[in-house]
Regions:
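Conserved, structured core segments of small domains
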Residues: 1-101
Length: 101
């Protein structure tokens, strides 16, 4: 397995109001099963807008597919960029997540 930092940025032309709220609900619902499956270590909003995720996937193609199908992307709310990284220093409680295949 490989590890990815996924950085999201809101689009300047993103929907506002109720359309944004609907996209947000869909975005949360989309990532919930991936969290349950162990693909997501954490995710959350940045104070500057949009958010970050740490993912564990088989490779760049899987990460890109997850990003492309995110309702924030399909709904024109945000763009995401994934960067692969190696986990060298790890908090002991997170060791199991990083070690699992």
């Amino acid at each position: 397995m490989k590890f990815y930092l996924v950085n999201g940025t809101f689009r300047e032309d993103m929907p506002k109001g109720p359309a944004f709220q609907e996209a947000l609900k869909a975005h949360h619902a989309y990532w919930a099963p991936h969290m349950q499956a162990g693909k997501v270590l954490f995710s959350g909003p940045k104070t500057s807008g949009a958010g970050l995720l740490i993912l564990k996937c088989s490779g760049a193609e899987e990460v890109q597919k997850l990003i492309d199908e995110d309702p924030f992307v399909t709904g024109g709310v945000a763009v995401f960029e994934a960067s692969e990284f190696s986990a060298f220093y790890k908090f002991p409680a997170a060791e199991q997540w990083f070690a699992a295949e």
